[in-house]
Design a protein with these regions (language model features):
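Conserved substrate/cofactor phosphate-moiety recognition/catalytic segment
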Residues: 1-62
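Structural alpha-beta junctions
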Residues: 2-9, 103-108, 154-158, 185-188
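Residue-level recognition of beta-strand->loop/alpha-helix junctions
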Residues: 11-13, 113-115, 163
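Loop/turn-to-beta-strand initiation segments
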Residues: 61-66, 108-110
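Conserved nucleotide-binding/hydrolysis micro-motifs of P-loop NTPases
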Residues: 72-74, 116-122, 166-168
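A glycine- and Lys/Arg-enriched "phosphate-lid" helix/loop adjacent to the NTP-binding pocket
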Residues: 78-150
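NTP-dependent small-molecule kinase module
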Residues: 129-131, 138-200
Length: 200
């Protein structure tokens, strides 16, 4: 909405389906969710491998507004903790290979880490639970530490981190809109100026 066209044709505006059992766009039936959850760790790892590699193809990265939520970093954190695969650190190693590929096809990628205090996250889990959420309250501190580790190990050059403990979603978005400016491409800037001129 801010940048204006081109709007991705035939693709969702973002991809946030890298945590079981929500591994695709659109809801599954309860029976299908149960089937996904019943898969063996080996099969879950295979599905994630294929899903992540699929989302690295040219059709996604031809869209300059490509947004991946969680992606390989979420997989490296949640795989060993909740899905019983990647205990040997292999998901982190795979993540670095994925980032090397991203750097070849989209060098201007910005890695954004959203975090909050353990207390704030626990409160949000109680007040606004995800119907099929993965995170368990007793794991909050461990998960926060693991996300920090994966982001620190990332080979992606550009990073933004937001502690949302005392920020509303609107405030976080407004701050991001300011901070992303230096990372916009010339094409992004041209689109932004044209859109502002057209919409006043």
């Amino acid at each position: 909405e801010t940048l204006g066209p081109p709007i991705p044709q035939g693709m969702p505006p973002f991809h946030d389906h890298f945590a079981f059992p929500d591994i695709g766009h659109g809801d599954l039936t309860e029976e299908e969710y149960a089937q996904v959850n019943a898969l063996s760790p080996k099969l879950k790892a295979m599905i994630q491998n294929h899903q992540i590699m699929y989302h690295l193809n040219d059709a996604f990265y031809a869209d300059h507004d490509n947004i991946m939520v969680g992606f390989h970093i979420e997989d490296a954190v949640y795989g060993p903790l909740y899905y019983d695969y990647g205990h040997d650190g292999s998901r982190s190693a795979i993540g670095r290979n994925i980032e090397n590929h991203i750097m070849e096809i989209a060098r201007d990628t910005v890695l954004v880490l959203l975090k909050a205090s353990p207390e704030a996250i626990a409160k949000r889990l109680k007040e606004s639970p995800h119907p099929r959420g993965v995170l368990k309250e007793q794991d909050i501190e461990k998960v926060l530490a693991r996300f920090d580790e994966e982001v620190a190990a990332s080979t992606l050059r550009y990073r933004l981190t937001y502690d949302t403990t005392d920020m509303t979603p609107e405030e976080t978005l407004a701050q991001f809109a300011k901070d992303i400016g230096p990372h916009l491409s010339e094409s992004d800037r041209s689109r932004l100026l044209a859109h502002r001129a057209l919409t006043g």
